[in-house]
């Protein structure tokens, strides 16, 4: 049986947490051939920008994550944002799974910039569903209410506060400076 070739198109490393429960589910399913791609992050020093590759990506590779720069040949592309170059991905199922909550209007602006591109848009609440259905730029895209997958671990009891504190060397007794 041919595997379904799936790409997680992650804009920035911090977006990945929005996909983690879904990534775990699909990586452990023999029906899927799972790949990842990232935008090149940059660090700014004064007015200069330099390419930056987050160290955590090496940790992901050790966990078996496979990265590619390819855009063609995927049956499904899951992204936390609309794709600037959706046509480059060819004939594929485009899934938009927001990496944050729906209080920003960037999705609406991005949909306006890509008329004719059909996304399956998965959102966190009924207000967002209603708002998108009223949006004049929705076009052929379809909207689905699913909640925020990145919170699944918390509600499934897989979130271990002590483990997180220890892993990142955090001390809850110290004041937080933003």
Enumerate the language-model features and the residues they cover:
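Active-site and donor-binding regions of nucleotide-sugar-utilizing enzymes
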Residues: 7-158, 163
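Nucleotide-sugar donor-binding and catalytic loop/hinge architecture
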Residues: 1-4, 158-178
């Amino acid at each position: 049986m041919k595997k379904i070739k799936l790409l997680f198109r992650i804009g920035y490393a911090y977006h990945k947490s929005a996909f983690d429960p879904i990534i775990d589910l699909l990586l452990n399913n023999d029906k899927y051939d799972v790949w990842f791609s990232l935008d090149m992050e940059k660090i700014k020093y004064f007015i200069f920008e330099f390419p930056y590759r987050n160290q955590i990506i090496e940790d992901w590779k050790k966990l078996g994550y496979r990265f590619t720069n390819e855009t063609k040949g995927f049956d499904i592309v899951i992204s936390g944002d609309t794709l600037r170059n959706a046509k480059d991905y060819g004939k594929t199922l485009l899934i938009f799974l927001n990496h944050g909550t729906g209080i920003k209007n960037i999705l609406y602006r991005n949909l306006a910039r890509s008329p004719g591109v059909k996304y399956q848009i998965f959102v966190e609440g009924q207000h967002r569903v209603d708002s998108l259905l009223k949006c004049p730029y929705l076009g052929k895209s379809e909207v689905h209410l699913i909640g925020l997958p990145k919170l699944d671990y918390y509600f499934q009891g897989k979130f271990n506060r002590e483990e997180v504190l220890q892993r990142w060397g955090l001390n809850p007794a110290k004041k937080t400076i933003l």
